[in-house]
C-alpha cells in the first residue's frame, strides 16, 4: 500500500522500456518510460484504475486500442478511490493519497484504514478478510487495546522513487514500489510480516 506525502523533490529519471519483458503486449507499443512513480487515475467508462505514470497509461492504452478495446482517459486522482458501487472484481494496485478513514473488522480485531480502498486492497492483495463496519465502533475502542490507527502508527513520508523490492510473507511473494512502502504495509497488517527477499521485482 502506498501512502506518499507529496513534496518537492529532485529525482533523476531512470529509463525503463515498458513492456519489453511481457509477451502479451504488442511490440509496436514499446516505449521508454521513466521509473519514477507519479501515479495518474484513468477511467475507461466502466472502471477506474491507477497507473504508475502517464507514460505507463499511454503504453497500456496503445495495446487496448490495437485490440479494439476502449482506452483509459486521465481523470482526477480522487475518483480512483474504491467505492461500494465499483466492480467487485477490481483490485487496486495502489490507493489514492486520501485520508477518509473507515473502520474494518477482521474477526475480533478492529482497525482503522486510511480509506476504503486500503481496506479492499488488504483483502484482495493480501488475502485478508476485513469487513467495513460503523466508524463509531472503532472510535469507541481504546487505542490501548487491539485497535490500530494507521494514521498515527504506520503512515510516514515516503519518496516517489520506483525502487522495487521483492518481499515474502511466508505464503506468497509481492513486489513493493520501495522499502518504505513495504514497511508501511507490514505495519498495517495484523498478521504475517513482509520480509525483504531481494531488490528488484519478484
Curated annotation (Swiss-Prot):
The keyword Nucleus does not apply. Its main location: secreted. Residues 1-20 form the signal peptide. Glycans are attached at residues 140, 193. The record marks 35-36, 97-98, 160-161 as: Reactive bond. The peptide presented here consists of a single Kazal domain but is suggested to be derived from a multidomain Kazal protein after proteolytic cleavage. This is U-Kazal-Dg21.2. It comes from Dolopus genitalis.
Amino acid at each position: 500500500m502506498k501512502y506518499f506525502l507529496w513534496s518537492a523533490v529532485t529525482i533523476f529519471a531512470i529509463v525503463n522500456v515498458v513492456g519489453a519483458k511481457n509477451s502479451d503486449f504488442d511490440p509496436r507499443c514499446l516505449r521508454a518510460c521513466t521509473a519514477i512513480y507519479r501515479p495518474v487515475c484513468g477511467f475507461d467508462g466502466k472502471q477506474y484504475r491507477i497507473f504508475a505514470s502517464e507514460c505507463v497509461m499511454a503504453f497500456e492504452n496503445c495495446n487496448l486500442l490495437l485490440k479494439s478495446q476502449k482506452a483509459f482517459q486521465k481523470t482526477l486522482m480522487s475518483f480512483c478511490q474504491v467505492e461500494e458501487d465499483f466492480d467487485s472484481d477490481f483490485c487496486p494496485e495502489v490507493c489514492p493519497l486520501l485520508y477518509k478513514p473507515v473502520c474494518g473488522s477482521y474477526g475480533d480485531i478492529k482497525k482503522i484504514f486510511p480509506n476504503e480502498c486500503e481496506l479492499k486492497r488488504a483483502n484482495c492483495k493480501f488475502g485478508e478478510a476485513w469487513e467495513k463496519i460503523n466508524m463509531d465502533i472503532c472510535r469507541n475502542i481504546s487505542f490501548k487495546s487491539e485497535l490500530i490507527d494507521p494514521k498515527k502508527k504506520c503512515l510516514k513520508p515516503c519518496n516517489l522513487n520506483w525502487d522495487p523490492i521483492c518481499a515474502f510473507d511466508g505464503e506468497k511473494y509481492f513486489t513493493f514500489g520501495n522499502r518504505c512502502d513495504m514497511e508501511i504495509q507490514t505495519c498495517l497488517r495484523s498478521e504475517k510480516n513482509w520480509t525483504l527477499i531481494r531488490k528488484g521485482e519478484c
